[in-house]
A protein has these predicted regions:
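Bacterial Sec-dependent N-terminal signal peptides
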Residues: 1-23, 454
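Periplasmic polypeptide-binding modules associated with outer-membrane biogenesis and secretion
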Residues: 19-112, 132, 146-165, 298-301, ...
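Coil residues (strongly favoring Ser/Thr
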Residues: 51, 81, 237-238, 328
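A short beta-strand motif that forms the metal-chelation/ATP-contact edge
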Residues: 89-94, 390, 446-450
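Gram-negative/organellar outer-membrane beta-barrel architecture
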Residues: 97-260, 265-268, 278, 335-341, ...
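Short glycine-rich beta-strand segments
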Residues: 179-183, 231-233, 283-289, 321-325, ...
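C-terminal outer-membrane beta-barrel translocator/porin domains of Gram-negative envelope proteins
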Residues: 256-383
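Outer-membrane beta-barrel transmembrane domain signature
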Residues: 362-372, 376, 381-419
């Protein structure tokens, strides 16, 4: 009887503690040899002095870890809490990434691996190579300096410096960049729903560009970016003979000022491979040039990831785009198959248009998590975590083109694909995808995709 009475009193005490609001007395951070403390503190959904119940603190800790990992500064984040004398003590331990990365560069010039392997006969001539000099977190404020020296099929020199916060409130930032590039071959048309290329003996296109942007991030989830970019492009005269409508005004040169606005809302578990949360992106671009060359573009993306269980989640991802004028020239009418508007199962095809939408939907199931021991013992990288997901997907899309032509039958047609695959997810936002899919043309195949965030 005494034992039951003791358990009853103890349970009441624990319930009282759980419901009691206690102040955050301190936040201790370790492991950040380069990153400034205030950059880490800025991402937390709580500050020193906040009064929180235990039931409020638990989800806040989960969100804090997600926000810190989404800075892409760390390979791991651990957060512990201690209740002592009616106060919370928060302990954050981070493992920093490599920030100085002189890396060899090797990349196919084609849109994806399968197009290079099949349509381009695995030609090693269609490869860009060189060096990427990447200094992330230059001053410990998550600022980045990138210098690319690329040669091979195309040549490119580019440099960019980005700093997210330049003010005391840690809300305003800027970026500046420069690019000079030349191409030996140019995609001049679409025929049979595939890209048509024309190679030039010297340079098919020359480009140089300078840009500057201002960013504003008032809280942990909202981001606004305004960018000014001036560019000058010239294509070879022989290109103009074959494709006179490559640029507006049937000219071989285009010089203009691009003014763009982007709004993002990012509240996902992982910015590279979200398993829960929301992501919204609105992008507007106005090209200021002569009347013949002025264009306007708008695109919007909405992603929703819903956790169904501890091992499964549903991912819904839709993107819509519109380009004006509606009868744009070829260089402004590439749509599905380019950039973020991709349909799994149509890797060999492109769909031109000036307005369109893509919907990508998938069910994912986590089948295995394991850790590999790094054969080369390196600080903060002794272990390599691996996650494997099985997935089933169904995609759909539509692209409107005023002058599609009979050979490009996928324009002005409802598109759909479906299939299954497996994703491998690891450190440095590495994602490798193996997918078997079938499209509405009745064609099916195995497709490989890889992403590495360096």
């Amino acid at each position: 009887m005494r034992l039951l009475f003791f358990i009853f009193i103890l349970s009441l005490s624990l319930t009282s503690v759980a419901q009691q609001k206690m102040p955050v007395a301190g936040i201790d951070i370790t492991g950040n040899s380069k990153t400034k403390d205030y950059i880490i503190l800025r991402e937390l959904p709580f500050v020193k002095g906040d009064s929180l119940e235990a039931k409020q603190l638990a989800p806040a800790i989960i969100q804090a870890k997600q926000l810190l990992m989404n800075t892409q500064l760390f390979v791991d984040v651990q957060i512990d809490t201690l209740a002592n004398d009616g106060q919370w003590q928060i302990r954050i331990q981070v493992k920093e990434r490599w920030y100085l990365l002189p890396l060899p560069y090797f990349r196919l010039v084609d849109r994806n691996f399968n197009q290079w392997w099949v349509d381009q006969n695995r030609s090693l001539d269609r490869v860009n190579y060189g060096m990427k000099f990447i200094q992330n977190n230059v001053s410990g404020r998550n600022d980045n300096l990138n210098v690319w020296l690329i040669t091979g099929y195309n040549r490119q020199f580019s440099a960019r410096y980005t700093i997210p916060f330049i003010d005391k409130k840690l809300t305003k930032g800027f970026s500046v960049g420069f690019l000079h590039a030349t191409q030996k071959e140019l995609n001049i048309a679409t025929a049979g729903n595939k890209q048509v290329f024309l190679r030039h003996s010297s340079d098919a296109r020359k480009t140089w560009r300078i840009d500057a942007s201002y960013s504003y991030r008032p809280d942990r989830f909202k981001r606004t970016t305004i960018r000014l970019s001036y560019f000058n492009e010239t294509i070879a005269d022989t290109i103009l003979i074959v494709q006179k409508n490559y640029y507006p005004g049937q000219t071989n040169r285009q010089a203009a000022l691009d003014i763009s606005y982007r709004y993002q809302y990012i509240n996902v578990s992982n910015i590279t491979y979200p398993t829960s949360g929301y992501y919204s992106d609105l992008f507007l671009l106005k090209r200021v040039a002569s009347r013949a060359q002025s264009i306007f573009q708008i695109s919007a993306r909405q992603l929703y990831a819903k956790k169904l269980s501890t091992k499964s989640f549903l991912l819904l991802d839709a993107t819509a785009a519109y380009k004006s004028p509606i009868d744009s020239v070829f260089s402004n009418s590439r749509l599905i198959g380019y950039g973020g508007m991709q349909l799994r199962g149509l890797e060999y095809y492109v769909v031109d248009g000036t307005a369109g939408i893509v919907s990508r939907n998938a069910f994912h199931f986590n089948v295995k998590n394991f850790t590999l021991t790094n054969p080369v013992p390196i600080k903060n990288h002794e272990k390599i975590p691996i996650r494997l997901y099985l997935k089933m997907f169904a995609d759909a899309g539509y692209a409107y083109h005023k002058y599609a032509g009979r050979s490009n039958s996928l324009s002005n047609t409802l598109l759909y694909t479906y299939g299954a695959g497996i994703d491998l997810v690891s450190v440095y936002d590495f994602v490798f995808r193996v997918e078997y899919s079938r499209n509405q043309l009745g064609r099916e195949g195995l497709y490989l995709q890889g992403e590495f965030n360096f």
